[in-house]
Amino acid sequence: MVSKSDQLLIVVSILEGRHFPKRPKHMLVVEAKFDGEQLATDPVDHTDQPEFATELAWEIDRKALHQHRLQRTPIKLQCFALDPVTSAKETIGYIVLDLRTAQETKQAPKWYQLLSNKYTKFKSEIQISIALETDTKPPVDSFKAKGAPPRDGKVPAILAGLDPRDIVAVLNEEGGYHQIGPAEYCTDSFIMSVTIAFATQLEQLIPCTMKLPERQPEFFFYYSLLGNDVTNEPFNDLINPNFEPERASVRIRSSVEILRVYLALQSKLQIHLCCGDQSLGSTEIPLTGLLKKGSTEINQHPVTVEGAFTLDPPNRAKQKLAPIPVELAPTVGVSVALQREGIDSQSLIELKTQNEHEPEHSKKKVLTPIKEKTLTGPKSPTVSPVPSHNQSPPTKDDATESEVESLQYDKDTKPNPKASSSVPASLAQLVTTSNASEVASGQKIAVPATSHHFCFSIDLRSIHALEIGFPINCILRYSYPFFGSAAPIMTNPPVEVRKNMEVFLPQSYCAFDFATMPHQLQDTFLRIPLLVELWHKDKMSKDLLLGIARIQLSNILSSEKTRFLGSNGEQCWRQTYSESVPVIAAQGSNNRIADLSYTVTLEDYGLVKMREIFISDSSQGVSAVQQKPSSLPPAPCPSEIQTEPRETLEYKAALELEMWKEMQEDIFENQLKQKELAHMQALAEEWKKRDRERESLVKKKVAEYTILEGKLQKTLIDLEKREQQLASVESELQREKKELQSERQRNLQELQDSIRRAKEDCIHQVELERLKIKQLEEDKHRLQQQLNDAENKYKILEKEFQQFKDQQNNKPEIRLQSEINLLTLEKVELERKLESATKSKLHYKQQWGRALKELARLKQREQESQMARLKKQQEELEQMRLRYLAAEEKDTVKTERQELLDIRNELNRLRQQEQKQYQDSTEIASGKKDGPHGSVLEEGLDDYLTRLIEERDTLMRTGVYNHEDRIISELDRQIREILAKSNASN
């Protein structure tokens, strides 16, 4: 056992945050994860300074703590923005705490900046402290008396007054259940489970404009059960979603009444279909039907709410999606069950198979029971039977599709060596008698007499002139079923090809032996080209088809024939053709991406002899077994001659061999039939699957096109209405145009008439004006003469006025008036200067008062500091007084003498200043008396006296000076002297 002192608590205090943006519709949550255990704070408002004020603690002993510190186990805190409406969590950032910084002594909290912060414009920070505390939890008693549960039918008074909004689910980690309601009264145990069983028509949730991740998008269902986020296993196929039904269960401790109230508040369970962090659709399952008022079903058996619920797209996608018909609506099969703990039930969900008897909203689906775990592993590749030589080869598109599928199968699984044995290798033993296109058609193959034995070889030499901007690891792949095998032929290993380089391909030579008629060979070569696919093989991702090269095999038929001798001495013919063909891009525009150099050879070995070819089940390939009659044995013994022929060992061995051959033929035929049946079944299932996929896609497209057709019909009707409106507007425009034309002609005629009349009026007016001008010329001459006479009179009068003005300026009254004007201007200027000086003086007094107050404060502070220094010096001097008394007395005498000299000099200086001020005041007073105007001097004395009194009062109000100060005494003396002078003058 671990001692009590070894039990510790790792306490992480999450206090507050700062530099967060304001999001009123969101909440902030911080989740902390350590050693696989996750804790979270309560949601707080998403403000700029959120207040968390939460402590999160993990129990640990010292040994485990030491181990975690050695391993540098971090404590990761993730901050989320929570949407209370949709319960969607949005990652904001995270913080990583080092466990080694936690100490048992209390440490000051620190600010930690969020890493990978979503709010890039804000440097969001959270104040956190981490510490170790001794676990002081009281020991758990092995036995405690528990309160008896309330009797049925009686609700305690405390529950009757409980606010329904205060009923929440609280996780009890020690007991492993959620407590709903007061723990002392709600003691019944329940199990609540949610099962997602199936889903259909999910492709309807994805609009045509939406883009999904390119590489295997994963879809899953998400829901929150009592605050626990639950997701099912991801699946990739939306058209045929294949996933195992999963049940999520939680234990609840409550009572029936409280649980009913809680379910009434949390009335709906929302389930989302997600792809990554994006919700494609959601549905709501009502929970109020689990516990109906007054019902006691839950005491006898589990209560359930189940069915196929329609998935609705989110608001942002609903605007882009067209309305979906009811029969094509996406649905999800969900069952929510609630039962008392301890009641035995076989299954909380009973999934039924309903065909024609089910209601309208269920779409004839077979729901898989929960107990059945339908494994969805990779399917084994289906090997289609090899067509015989008289079957028509597939078209180009079909061949390409089958080749892509077979390449995927080759990547996923390794083919059975018996099922996909090398056809050329097995037929090489037949020399010139086997037909490669008839390997899988039966055990006995009849070759027509007109068929020739051909050998076709192809050598893909090199890839050059690459036009792709990145290096590729290329392999070449092709298939030509006419040669007897639909299996793809590939080069291996992949070679790296870069731009402006030529790379020779390894293992690129392949030869095919087959029997066919020359005209059929020529017809096939003319119709069907050989498609060579260029693939980029990537270890980190799926292989990529880059392009396809088309090799026209008919070119070899027009090449020159050369004669050679076969292995049996017969005359044979050979044709060879070499060429470089472009590789066309598989996607996008038909641009050349590379060039492929190849060499093909066709050898004709002549007619195939009429015979039957037997195919055995040997793993070495196909072999023809021909028994020739053995020659007579030399010198037989008499005992051997008398023995029956059927009893000889040779006959028995031959008989056993024939029986074994027949048995092997039967076994091989059965195996072929079983393989054919399995392959046909797999092919049929795949065909049905693809047919269903195509049918669902066609239905979806038909629904979309129907909606588009309706829109087009509506648009067409609108266009017809618009055309009619335009026609009516055009006719109205023509009518108005004619009216405007006639109006224009009428206005033009009126304008011509008015111009003619205006011309006549103008001619008459010109004649009148000419007469007026002649009259005005005469008046002008007369007035010009009068003007000359008036100018002469004006000059005479102006000269007389100038003489009179000069006479008036010489008089004294005029000169005095001008001086008065000048003095008035000077007076105004002096008054302005006086007012400015008065304002400056007042400002100076205010500044001087402030300076005096500041000086008093500084003086007081200096006195206090001097007193403190003096006290300190006195203490020091008291200690040294006895030792340095004589020297100190001498220094004191010198210092006092110096101070007396300084005081004497200061007194002399003050006396001189007083004398100077007295002389100035005397001069002022005498000057005022001796002036020509006595009243003006008295006014100057009064002003000077007033100024002195104001200065004295101002200095006294500052609090720095008193009546004993020298400057105040001097001001009082001057005031008394001026008062005495004024009294004497009076």
From Swiss-Prot:
Principal subcellular localization: cytoplasm
SUPFAM superfamilies on file: C2 domain (Calcium/lipid-binding domain, CaLB) (SSF49562)
Location of the C2 domain: 1-112, 433-566
Protein known as: Centrosomal protein of 120 kDa
Mutation effect (residue 975 to S): Found in a patient with Meckel syndrome; uncertain significance
Ranges in a coiled coil: 669-925
Entry keyword annotation includes Phosphoprotein: yes
InterPro entries the UniProt entry points to: C2_dom, C2_domain_sf, CEP120-like, DUF3668
Species per Swiss-Prot/TrEMBL record: Homo sapiens
Gene it is expressed from: CEP120
Cell compartment(s), UniProt: Cytoplasm, Cytoskeleton, Microtubule organizing center, Centrosome
A Pfam family it matches: DUF3668
Modified-residue entries (Phosphoserine), positions: 935
UniProt disease link: Short-rib thoracic dysplasia 13 with or without polydactyly: A form of short-rib thoracic dysplasia, a group of autosomal recessive ciliopathies that are characterized by a constricted thoracic cage, short ribs, shortened tubular bones, and a 'trident' appearance of the acetabular roof. Polydactyly is variably present. Non-skeletal involvement can include cleft lip/palate as well as anomalies of major organs such as the brain, eye, heart, kidneys, liver, pancreas, intestines, and genitalia.
Subunit field text: Interacts with TACC2, TACC3, CCDC52, TALPID3.
Annotated segments matching region Disordered: 350-424, 914-937
Protein's job: Plays a role in the microtubule-dependent coupling of the nucleus and the centrosome. Involved in the processes that regulate centrosome-mediated interkinetic nuclear migration (INM) of neural progenitors and for proper positioning of neurons during brain development. Also implicated in the migration and selfrenewal of neural progenitors. Required for centriole duplication and maturation during mitosis and subsequent ciliogenesis. Required for the recruitment of CEP295 to the proximal end of new-born centrioles at the centriolar microtubule wall during early S phase in a PLK4-dependent manner.
Family from the record: Belongs to the CEP120 family.
